[in-house]
Amino acid sequence: TLFQVNGPVGLATWKDYCYDLSKSDVYKDVESDDYVLKDGDAVDGIAYVIETYGLIYNKALLNKYFELPDASIKSIDELNNFQALKTVAEEIQAHKDDLGVEGAFTSAGMDSSSDWRFKTHLANLPIYYEYKADGIDSTDAIKGTYLDNYKQIWDLYLNNSTCEPSMISSKTGDDAASEFSLGEAVFYQNGTWAYNDIKDNEVAEEDMGMLPIYIGVDGEENQGLCTGSENYWCVNKNASEEDIQATLDFMKWVVESDEGRDMLANQMGFVTPFTTFADYLPDNPLVKANAEYTEAGKTPVSWNFTTMPSENWKNNLGGALLNYAQGTGTWDSVQTAFVDGWAEEYAAANE
């Protein structure tokens, strides 16, 4: 009776089976409609876990950089836009021997265990800003308005990393996690879920922070971290009334009872979008970093990659990013995969 979809694209396949949750207790407990999937006034899905990603950073190493006599940026408060990030990354790279690191950024691995960080999560930024500028929340034809911004952050990763750009095809997600957790790199693009991969190593808990991914857009000083969900509860409307009610009761128990909340927050380590979880935050410094940005009034970047037209679109974009990095392709190919590929894949998926 209870099933899960990953967002608007997944919902399109299953929406005819979705029970309207608009009058449910669990919907009343949601912080905002940012965390629900709607079809008109009907609530088809409710996120039960929200996650956050950005640039995980090593506070101790960054402070070591700030203390360099010729460091242009002297505090984390100044590191609030792309130009500042570029300056810091390039100066860390120039002083990597002094700082005892292999590079400013961990390797941008493009094997299948890591490429999603760039073809999906990094690509979310230009999509987010285009949607925001155009006042939309999905499209059948992306324009690529912010592709120059995508290029400059990708270039920054490639040119200020623990490895040469030509080596990224064989670099893995484990490589990047290891480089960060051993103190070989200052910045690591990933999310709150990566905590378990990097804890209990060289980087102390109190030295783990997270920065927004700045790509050089006006006003990004007020940008927060990328926060959203790919995990939405849906209820099968074709089930018996008895089963539907039992499922609604179970969902209410999960988000309102002490036992249910303890299970989600502490045993599973989830951050949830429910008002009932104020006292149930997992013991994860990356989660706390996001809470600090929210409290400071920063605007979170929504997860718009859930509107990407297909896996094929992501894979073609990833291939173009890799070819560009290795010098076997041009940025024009990235643009083609991003813009033309979107229209083609959207049309194919919605025939």
Model-derived features: where do they sit?
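Short, solvent-exposed loop/beta-turn-alpha elements that line the ligand-binding surface or hinge
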Residues: 22-33, 74-80, 109, 127-152, ...
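Extracytoplasmic/periplasmic solute-binding protein
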Residues: 40-48, 53, 83-139, 185
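Extracytoplasmic/periplasmic substrate-recognition and gating elements
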Residues: 201-269
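Hinge/lid segment of periplasmic solute-binding proteins
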Residues: 3-63, 117, 207-213
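Conserved N-terminal structural module of periplasmic/extracytoplasmic solute-binding proteins
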Residues: 1-10, 23-26, 217-220, 242, ...
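Conserved C-terminal helix/tail region of periplasmic/extracytoplasmic solute-binding proteins
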Residues: 258-262, 272-281, 294-351
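Glycine-centered hinge/linker elements that transmit conformational signals in sensory
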Residues: 87-90, 133-171
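Short helix-initiation/N-cap motifs at beta->coil->alpha
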Residues: 79-84, 167-182
